[in-house]
Amino acid sequence: RVFKPRENDLFHVETDFAAPADERLYGMGLNATGGVNLKGCVIDLYQRHVKHVVPFLVSSKGYGFLWNNPSLGRAEFAHNRTRWVSRGCRQIDYYITTGDSYAEIMEHYADVTGHAPMLPEWASGFWQCKLRYKTQDEFLEVAREFKRRGLPLAVHVIDFRHWKHIGDWKLDPDFWPDPEAMVRELDEMGTRIMISPWILVEERSENFAPMKEQGLFTGLIDGTEDT
């Protein structure tokens, strides 16, 4: 183990475990590793667009491992050992469980972190989304075509650039003039709408100044300043 003092009463910690070469490791959230088995991969422990880390894995050797240190860090799954690194924590904290199946291991994990409620039926239906629908008419026409063809459409997603300025968190009225009518029409089709908020805020947005004043922005990844 490595336990080095840092600023603000924090420590840089590293913990190594022996790992057999034939072990297969799965999990760790959403990471573009190019494969399912994480053996041989290095996972950076931070969140960003299209990278969503959950520091929990299951092993073909019958155990699950949760790295319970909320800080920037790294997980290294080498041929002969596994190393967990935290760049700023107050103690080394991890949880290990075992089971006869992956399902049993995952059940133990949920016992300590919380069980997710069952999704409503509509949420397991077909979701239609693309990077951008430019206008309300374009968005509605896609849903109407689904209906004309008799295809089920559970959720229709309004994604990128539906705003005037990013961070407004409302539809641009120049291109989405009547949201209430749009919602009513899709509701009559049995389709729900989901809007992807895109949580960036540009300086031209009406929300930038009040959020900046209240210190609501996150900092850079190294914690040195606001973004």
Placement of each model-derived feature along the sequence:
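Catalytic and substrate-binding clefts that recognize carbohydrates or anionic sugar/phosphate headgroups
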Residues: R1-E121, K130-R132, Q136, A143-R148
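Aromatic-lined carbohydrate-binding/catalytic grooves of carbohydrate-active enzymes
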Residues: P117-T227
